[in-house]
């Protein structure tokens, strides 16, 4: 009997679905700003950024398929049932009301409303009003899921991508400066690869891939593929197609960002940079189109995230707190957070991402190599414990200086700097994870087979 697999056309459809899930307007602000910071070192910056903003997210989706899991909670549950619940909650809150949803509102405001205000001195008030209207729409459609998100996805997203392509081509044909002539900022002068690797965390796509991988699997199943191995293969191949498109967009965005330094000073954030570039090359009309399309794209993303988070928490709590209640709670919290502003949200998210990404990357890696140790729980535990401990030091290091002083973190940070290789590159968790894996494998191989399978 022949195992059904996706056709090329179907793989392209799945790749398009995955691209729509991953790539929102917020993803554009990081590569453009990265290009401005990296300058002539744009190529190593591209490589580092693509690894964490494309490679790991694609493999995160594939990890759900390869392990035949029915979602993130099942995959993380290979460590323990409690860990599966904890990690699922943490990831959904991060890509939901803590950072990603509020960021959607502030990206829309920064690219759409803020440029028209000038130095009014009342930007906080306009942000408050804008975010109130934005989240009123988000809540309305989250409580009444219907064709609005499909309409935005089928019409607004293609318009946005076409507009973005026109903008990038215009910028490439008339660059403000050659990227090779742009001086990098201090952090990117001697080593652009490692800072860019960490910059890719900001997209949050690796943890989003873990959270939404099951959605892609369901799409493939609805296309008639039922064999688990075939599903895993189709997830990976479709993901690679998505990754190629995302990588192309990131490469162009980073290059245009670097070239824009010939026209503008280093911007406060990527939203400001994108608005400046659109205004320079396409005028006021270009800025307006950018603002409208990004706002609708961010609206769609926010509705999807509120819906996904509310459904997940409704399921995990057994309906004790209704979907409607979760949707209202997450929307209200996102509204409150959005009013700290885009730059603040990005800055506040860094320590949390430094804490979450290492165990997420470790989980994805273990999912891929798990067949070599039968997905023995002891190996997962042996890797996760040192990874979390080491990631905690990265979390401490990236906290604001005032928080470090208040919490008396100088001593533990200095300890980590002296004892963890690559700590200065924000990868101090890597060696502990490898050592933990080695210990776990030794433990696994020394145990009776029936114990390892337990």
Give the predicted meaning of each segment.
Residues 142-171, 349-361, 380-390:
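Membrane-interface loop-to-helix entry segments
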Residues 174, 185, 193, 376, ...:
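A generic transmembrane alpha-helix motif of multi-pass inner-membrane proteins
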């Amino acid at each position: 009997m022949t195992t059904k697999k996706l056709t090329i056309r179907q793989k392209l459809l799945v790749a398009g679905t995955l691209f729509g899930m991953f790539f929102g307007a917020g993803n554009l602000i990081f590569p453009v700003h990265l290009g401005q910071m990296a300058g002539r070192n744009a190529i190593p910056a591209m490589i580092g950024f693509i690894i964490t903003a494309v490679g790991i997210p694609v493999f995160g989706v594939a990890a759900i398929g390869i392990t035949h899991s029915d979602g993130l909670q099942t995959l993380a549950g290979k460590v323990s049932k409690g860990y599966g619940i904890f990690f699922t909650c943490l990831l959904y809150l991060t890509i939901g009301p803590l950072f990603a949803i509020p960021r959607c509102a502030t990206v829309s405001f920064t690219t759409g409303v803020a440029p028209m205000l000038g130095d009014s001195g009342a930007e906080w008030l306009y942000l408050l009003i804008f975010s109130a209207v934005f989240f009123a729409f988000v809540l309305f459609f989250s409580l009444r899921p219907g064709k609005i998100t499909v309409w935005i996805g089928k019409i607004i997203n293609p318009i946005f991508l076409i507009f973005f392509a026109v903008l990038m081509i215009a910028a490439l044909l008339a660059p403000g400066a050659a990227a090779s002539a742009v001086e990098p900022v201090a952090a990117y002068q001697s080593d652009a690869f490692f800072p860019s690797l960490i910059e890719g965390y900001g997209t949050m796509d690796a943890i989003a891939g873990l959270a939404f991988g099951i959605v892609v699997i369901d799409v493939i199943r609805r296309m008639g593929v039922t064999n688990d191995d075939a599903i895993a293969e189709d997830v990976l191949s479709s993901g690679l197609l998505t990754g190629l498109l995302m990588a192309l967009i990131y490469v162009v965005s980073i290059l245009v960002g670097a070239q824009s330094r010939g026209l503008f000073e280093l911007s406060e954030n990527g939203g400001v940079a994108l608005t400046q570039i659109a205004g320079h090359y396409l005028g006021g009309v270009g800025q307006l189109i950018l603002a409208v399309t990004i706002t609708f794209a961010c609206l769609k993303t926010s509705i999807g995230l509120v819906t996904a988070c509310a459904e997940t928490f409704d399921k995990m709590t057994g309906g004790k707190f209704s979907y409607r209640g979760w949707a209202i709670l997450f929307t209200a919290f996102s509204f409150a957070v959005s009013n700290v502003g885009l730059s603040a949200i990005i800055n506040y998210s860094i320590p949390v991402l430094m804490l979450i990404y290492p165990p997420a990357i470790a989980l994805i890696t273990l999912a891929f190599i798990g067949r070599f140790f039968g997905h023995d729980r002891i190996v997962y535990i042996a890797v996760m414990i040192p990874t979390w401990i080491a990631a905690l030091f990265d979390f401490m290091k990236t906290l604001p200086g005032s928080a470090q002083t208040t919490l008396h973190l100088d001593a533990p940070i200095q300890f980590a700097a002296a004892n963890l290789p690559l700590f200065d590159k924000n990868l101090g968790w890597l060696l502990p994870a490898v050592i933990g894996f080695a210990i776990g494998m030794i433990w696994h191989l020394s145990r009776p087979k029936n114990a390892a399978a337990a």
